[in-house]
């Protein structure tokens, strides 16, 4: 009799609309209960039975119940699931399979089965890609997943690489395809094979994409020709190889190996500027005045060159610093190295005075054995030879940015707008508390930004610099010319790595149109979105593989007295993140390791400090000694403890 009662339906509707609800993200804990985080200030308790309906990270709408002054959340509706496609480890075998997601806060096994057409018999320990098919908040009885891809077996030494690439849905190998002959581009190539071009790279580099030639001119001027490998001489726009490169957008450099953007035949051979091999190039000739200014007579042209020597960073640096036993093979090569060092000196000074120079940070290199085991991790400081190449590339990219801007009005530009205007007042207020006075309007201009950066670089520590990083905007890829505040430049467009960056290939095609005096089509904005997304995924993949290898490397140091110098990189409510100076590993120091009495301890992310009893004991950028307390292999996390 109540079935179609309109009054009852109305009452139900009323009760539903009057019941308080909240939307937020589920945060799981190790203890079985969880929280619904609505915003930074507000969260609701989710009891263990209700947590069975949801997963950490799910965005949900929940009914809020109040009992005896205590509020709790009952999940009602799924807004966005945390898990859709994921990687994990298979449990069980044959017809009763489950998968445990590879995530620090997801511990429960999810029942699953292999997708139709997936011809692999899964067994305990296998790694797989899965997709969620059922969720309790969608009216299903339980969670359920489908295995869509077999990654590898549990004991594979190369699990860190294969699992990471599968997680981010990135390619595992070089693209297929061959380039049989050069295209007829209607370009006249200058024959520069007689000039003493050299390449400077790591000893193991195969994909050499830049060669340099320097010459002294009257009036204390120097000429530099930067010759860049020319893959667009082989790859037609819109061809199969071009489309594959467009999707990959970059060569993916992971510890131990890379996955190239172009077929290896091109990247490591046909396009690589190998010593004593004739190669087509796109070149830029520039004149530098005595103070390092790039004069206006910039010239881009197509050419053929023959590199006369493959030089190695450390050997060149040693020779210029009068150490080591390496010698250039001829006086002509020695003269090139001396002139290039002079150019580097001039350009470095010019950028220091008129733009911005990044602080040198070492690169960390993993030395791996046959089975992917980490034999060592070495810090490679940036030396004079690295800076020679860096200054030449930056100068060449400044030239391209100018030419594309003035001749076409578009290109693929790296743009960085400095500080977000919305943060300008907060930034000025923060700096004022540290005795630095800046004008909130001026700091949004390129000159104002550079002025502030120079003042920060002159500070005795990097503490203040670390405090203002959160006010900065992110660098972007744009088809419009625009300033790059981070480099202190009016415009910056890269074209010097076309073997490994698709954006540089686009700029090559545009520069060739300028050389031929032809009109060119503006690149579509979608390509910049794809490039930015791929750059983000590649960086995450590099970090994930690195975390895995660091955990492997430091595992036997856990619980020992081995000390490591560590720089504090971040402070949060839960503790501090530090970077080990010798090898670059990131470790976490939980708050209880800093001080036993929680009420006397204040860890402030806002101030970048740790205070004990009101006294600042640690701050971001401090270097402290730590030992490794624990390495958790399943989450690839390293827990450290300060040395008392």
UniProtKB/Swiss-Prot annotation:
The keyword Nuclease applies. Its main location: cytoplasm. It comes from the Bacteria. Coiled coil: none annotated. GO terms for biological process: mRNA catabolic process. Residues 561-643 form the S1 motif domain. Signal peptide: none annotated. One of its GO terms (molecular function) is RNA binding. SMART domains: CSP, RNB. InterPro entries: CSD, NA-bd_OB-fold, RNase_B_OB_dom, RNase_II, RNase_II/R, RNase_II/R_CS, RNase_II/RNase_R, RNR_Ribonuclease. It catalyses: Exonucleolytic cleavage in the 3'- to 5'-direction to yield nucleoside 5'-phosphates. Pfam families: OB_RNB, RNB, S1. One of its GO terms (cellular component) is cytosol. Involved in mRNA degradation. Hydrolyzes single-stranded polyribonucleotides processively in the 3' to 5' direction. Belongs to the RNR ribonuclease family. RNase II subfamily. This is Exoribonuclease 2. The gene is rnb.
């Amino acid at each position: 009799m109540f079935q179609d009662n309109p009054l009852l339906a109305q009452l139900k509707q009323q009760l539903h609309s009057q019941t308080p609800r909240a939307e937020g993200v589920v945060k799981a804990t190790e203890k079985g209960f969880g929280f619904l985080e609505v915003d930074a200030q507000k969260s609701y308790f989710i009891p263990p039975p209700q947590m069975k309906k949801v997963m950490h990270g799910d965005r949900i709408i929940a009914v809020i119940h109040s009992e005896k002054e205590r509020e709790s959340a009952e999940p009602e509706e799924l807004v966005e699931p945390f898990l859709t496609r994921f990687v994990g480890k298979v449990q069980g075998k044959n017809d009763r399979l489950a998968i445990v997601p590879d995530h620090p806060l997801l511990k429960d096994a999810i029942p699953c089965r292999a997708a139709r057409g997936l011809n692999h018999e899964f067994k305990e320990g296998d790694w797989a890609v899965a997709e969620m098919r059922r969720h309790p908040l969608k009216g299903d009885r339980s969670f359920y997943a489908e295995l869509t891809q077999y990654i590898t077996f549990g004991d594979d030494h190369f699990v860190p690489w294969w699992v990471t690439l599968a997680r981010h849905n990135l390619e595992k190998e070089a693209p297929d395809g061959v380039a049989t002959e050069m295209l007829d581009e209607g370009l006249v190539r200058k024959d520069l094979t007689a000039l003493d071009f050299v390449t400077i790279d790591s000893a193991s580099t195969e994909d050499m994409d830049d060669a340099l030639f320097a010459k002294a001119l009257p009036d204390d001027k120097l000429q530099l020709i930067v010759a860049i490998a020319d893959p667009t001489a082989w790859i037609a726009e819109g061809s199969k190889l071009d489309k594959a490169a467009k999707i990959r957008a970059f060569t993916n450099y992971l510890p131990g190996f890379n996955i190239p953007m172009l077929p290896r035949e091109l990247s490591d051979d046909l396009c690589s500027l190998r010593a004593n091999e004739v190669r087509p190039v796109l070149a830029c000739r520039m004149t530098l005045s005595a103070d390092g200014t790039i004069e206006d007579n910039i010239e881009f042209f197509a050419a053929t060159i023959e590199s006369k020597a493959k030089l190695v960073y450390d050997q060149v640096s040693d020779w210029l610093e009068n150490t080591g036993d390496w010698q250039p093979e001829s006086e002509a090569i020695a003269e090139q190295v001396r002139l290039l060092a002079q150019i580097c000196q001039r350009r470095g000074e010019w950028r220091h005075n008129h733009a911005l120079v990044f602080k040198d940070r070492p690169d960390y290199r993993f030395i791996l054995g046959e089975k992917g085991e980490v034999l060592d991790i070495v810090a490679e400081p940036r030396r004079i030879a690295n800076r020679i190449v860096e200054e030449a590339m930056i100068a060449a990219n400044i030239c391209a940015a100018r030419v594309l801007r003035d001749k076409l009005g578009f290109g693929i530009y790296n743009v960085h707008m400095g500080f977000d205007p919305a943060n300008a007042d907060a930034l000025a207020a923060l700096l004022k508390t540290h005795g630095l006075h800046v004008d909130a309007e001026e700091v949004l201009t390129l000159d104002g930004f550079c002025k502030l950066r120079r003042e920060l670089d002159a500070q005795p520590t990097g503490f203040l610099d670390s405090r203002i990083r959160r006010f900065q905007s992110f660098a972007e890829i744009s088809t419009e010319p625009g300033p790059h505040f981070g480099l202190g430049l009016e415009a910056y467009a890269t074209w010097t790595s076309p073997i490994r960056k698709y954006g540089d290939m686009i700029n090559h095609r545009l520069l060739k149109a300028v050389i031929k005096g032809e009109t060119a089509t503006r690149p579509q904005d979608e390509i910049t979105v794809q490039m930015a997304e791929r750059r983000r995924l590649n960086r995450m993949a590099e970090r994930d593989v690195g975390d895995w290898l660091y955990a492997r490397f430091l595992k036997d140091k856990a619980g020992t007295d081995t000390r490591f110098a560590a720089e504090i990189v971040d402070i949060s409510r839960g503790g501090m993140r530090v970077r080990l100076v010798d090898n670059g590993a990131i470790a976490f120091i939980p708050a209880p390791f800093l001080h036993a009495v929680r009420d006397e301890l204040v860890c402030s992310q806002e101030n970048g400090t740790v205070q004990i009893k009101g006294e600042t004991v640690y701050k971001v950028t401090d270097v402290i000694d730590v030992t490794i307390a624990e390495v958790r292999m399943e989450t690839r996390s390293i827990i450290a403890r300060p040395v008392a």
